Structures are given as C-alpha cells and as structure tokens.
C-alpha cells in the first residue's frame, strides 16, 4: 500500500468536506450585498459543487474563470460528475448584465500564481473583472508550503482595493490525518507499506 503522508504529523481525523458547505452558507447569508469571488483548487470538483449549490440557493449566477477551472468543470459536466442547475452558469462576458449582489465568480489563483485569474484581478490587469469595495474574496484553500508570500501579496493587493478578504475556516484538507492513516492500514492490512507524497519529515512520521 502506498499511502499519502502529507498530514501524517496531524492528529485525529481530517474534517469532512460538509463543514465547508456550512461555512459557505454562512458567508453567502452574511454578504448578500456583495459580489463574491471564490478562489479554490480547480481539481476540487466537490468544493466547486458546494459553491454552485450555495449560489443557486441564494439566487446568484455563477461565473467560472481561469483556464484550468473552466476545463475541469467542462470535463466534470460531460462525465456527469457535477450538477449545475439550469440558468445558473453564465459566461464572464455577461457578468456586467447582473448586479454584483447576484453573482459569484469561481476562480483559479488560490496559491498566488502570477498568471492565474485572481492574481490578474488583484493587480488590475484582468480584462473582465475589476476589484472594488463591493467585493468579498474567499480563499477556499490553504497555502501550499512555499506559496505563503505569493498568497499574502495577492491578499494585500485585494485589500488595498477595498475588498474584504476571507481566508479562515473555508477549507478542509484533502489529505489523511493520523487516524485516517491508521484506519486505512487496519482495513487493507497490506503486506508492504510505502509512505509517499510529502516532505521527508512527513514520510518519517507515517513510517
């Protein structure tokens, strides 16, 4: 068994993705006068589904921005892995047709990548989205080790434009913690165990 080691130093179980859904509901409820821009990993299809579900509940149109985000959601739709209610998804070119408080933008750039959509919005070079005081930006991810400075730079640029930035309690890890790792070993009972994925100290912690 090759088992993920990324969270091998963290005690307990990894929290359920459902907890993020409750957080989204609270944020949408408390920011009904703002445009919401949510940055997350494009590969986290379940997270994107939760955002879309909450947007639909609150009567907001959803715009997907960022090449990888668009490509993955298109693929997920074709495979039946994501369900988008009719008339919820709109093209970014139609964003101006709706008031700010009726829209949500799901975007790439949660790790502060220079050319990602959110970074271009923050640095005022995005062609379709301009950030202002009526925007609430939600980072639904944690910085990958080494990306902290890049993420902080983007947050600073967003806040300098008057936007509110939320980056706490809007993410749960996709990696197994100690009790999850113990559980999978007890269920599989492998002949050989190979810790993978993580820094050396993470591999040692699992071993």
Locations of regions flagged by a protein language model:
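Acidic/His-rich, metal-assisted hydrolase cores and their charged scaffolds
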Residues: 1-207
């Amino acid at each position: 068994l090759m088992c993920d080691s990324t969270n091998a130093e963290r005690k307990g179980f990894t929290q359920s993705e459902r907890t993020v859904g409750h957080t989204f509901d609270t944020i949408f409820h408390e920011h009904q006068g703002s445009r919401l821009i949510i940055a997350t990993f494009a590969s986290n299809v379940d997270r994107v589904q939760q955002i879309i579900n909450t947007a639909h509940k609150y009567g907001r149109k959803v715009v997907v921005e960022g090449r990888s985000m668009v490509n993955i959601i298109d693929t997920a739709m074709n495979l039946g892995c994501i369900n988008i209610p009719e008339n919820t998804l709109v093209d970014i070119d139609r964003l101006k047709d709706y008031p700010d408080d009726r829209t949500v933008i799901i975007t790439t750039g949660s790790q502060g990548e220079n050319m990602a959509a959110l970074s271009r919005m923050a640095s005022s070079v995005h062609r379709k989205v301009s950030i202002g005081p009526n925007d609430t930006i939600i980072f639904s991810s944690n910085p990958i080790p080494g990306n902290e400075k890049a993420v902080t730079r983007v947050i600073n640029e967003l806040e300098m434009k008057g936007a509110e930035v939320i980056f706490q309690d809007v993410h749960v890890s996709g990696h197994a913690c100690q009790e999850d790792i113990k559980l999978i070993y007890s269920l599989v009972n492998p002949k050989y165990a190979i810790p993978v994925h993580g820094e050396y100290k993470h591999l040692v912690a699992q071993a």
